[in-house]
Amino acid sequence: MPLLLLLPLLWAGALAMDPNFWLQVQESVTVQEGLCVLVPCTFFHPIPYYDKNSPVHGYWFREGAIISRDSPVATNKLDQEVQEETQGRFRLLGDPSRNNCSLSIVDARRRDNGSYFFRMERGSTKYSYKSPQLSVHVTDLTHRPKILIPGTLEPGHSKNLTCSVSWACEQGTPPIFSWLSAAPTSLGPRTTHSSVLIITPRPQDHGTNLTCQVKFAGAGVTTERTIQLNVTYVPQNPTTGIFPGDGSGKQETRAGVVHGAIGGAGVTALLALCLCLIFFIVKTHRRKAARTAVGRNDTHPTTGSASPKHQKKSKLHGPTETSSCSGAAPTVEMDEELHYASLNFHGMNPSKDTSTEYSEVRTQ
């Protein structure tokens, strides 16, 4: 009796290890979160003559699934319900009618970790390949976007910056690009895996951060890259010197030098004119003073018949007249002296007064 009970078990085990049913698949695969992977797979099964015209359906199940109750994660059977969390992300790309059971996984998520097995059904022929199974490992997303800057950044000149994720999958959900920058920017054209930012930097933007952030919405993960802007600033109107060259320098530099030279020459000429004018005024004033002194001396003629008293009085007033030329004596006394002298003297001034006149002229 115990032997009769063992016979069905042995028969089931023989079906499970039936050499007519075999499968080749990569036993372990690793994929980064948010990315995709394609797992090649091939299987074989015997085809009874009565099932030759039956369609072939393939299914991928999680390890431990109960076929009659649990839904597969992927299948080529159109009316078959699949697991909600894997719908649209797990796909049976291979054609089971051609013995192809290849599986595609896109927008990989952490909860996709685990083992999976394949099952085929063709008419009355149905078989689950429990060995080997596929083991899926989902790791952190370590890839980062790449930022391309063509040429150098100059203040006031627009440049197109490109952020790309060439390592992303074509079949997955298109990533979402975001830019963060303090400089004036605007969005340019974009493709599935790249975005263009039009930036017009300013001098104060040198050394500031620019970030390109990429979100993979299908997996809920984000990656980014940050760079520092290198804005090359060259002064537009330098006037500190003239540098030799081939004549191809900027007009602004030459104009600045010419304007500086003209301004310097103008200032120099103005100073020279002021000095000449001052010198002319002083010289003219002194000449007038000298002529006035000579005229006053001529209005005091002396005669031989003049009394000694008158001569003495005239000599006493001589220094007063000389002082009056320099503005030291009062004008009233000067007029009185001139009136008195004109009535009493008819001769030339003494030689002493003449020498005094030339002594004053030499002081000019």
UniProtKB/Swiss-Prot annotation:
Gene Ontology terms: cellular component: cell surface; external side of plasma membrane; Golgi apparatus; peroxisome; plasma membrane; specific granule membrane; tertiary granule membrane
InterPro entries with a match to the protein in the record: Ig-like_dom (IPR007110), Ig-like_dom_sf (IPR036179), Ig-like_fold (IPR013783), Ig_sub (IPR003599), Ig_V-set (IPR013106), Immunoglobulin_dom (IPR013151), SIGLEC (IPR051036)
Coiled-coil residues: none
Transmembrane segments: 260-282
GO BP term, example: positive regulation of protein secretion
Family: Belongs to the immunoglobulin superfamily. SIGLEC (sialic acid binding Ig-like lectin) family.
Native species: Homo sapiens
Source species, domain of life: Eukaryota
Residues involved in N-acetylneuraminate binding: 119
Protein name: Myeloid cell surface antigen CD33
Domain statement: Contains 2 copies of a cytoplasmic motif that is referred to as the immunoreceptor tyrosine-based inhibitor motif (ITIM). This motif is involved in modulation of cellular responses. The phosphorylated ITIM motif can bind the SH2 domain of several SH2-containing phosphatases.
Biological role: Sialic-acid-binding immunoglobulin-like lectin (Siglec) that plays a role in mediating cell-cell interactions and in maintaining immune cells in a resting state. Preferentially recognizes and binds alpha-2,3- and more avidly alpha-2,6-linked sialic acid-bearing glycans. Upon engagement of ligands such as C1q or syalylated glycoproteins, two immunoreceptor tyrosine-based inhibitory motifs (ITIMs) located in CD33 cytoplasmic tail are phosphorylated by Src-like kinases such as LCK.
Segments carrying motif ITIM motif 1: 338-343
Assembly: Homodimer; disulfide-linked. Interacts with PTPN6/SHP-1 and PTPN11/SHP-2 upon phosphorylation. Interacts with C1QA (via C-terminus); this interaction activates CD33 inhibitory motifs.
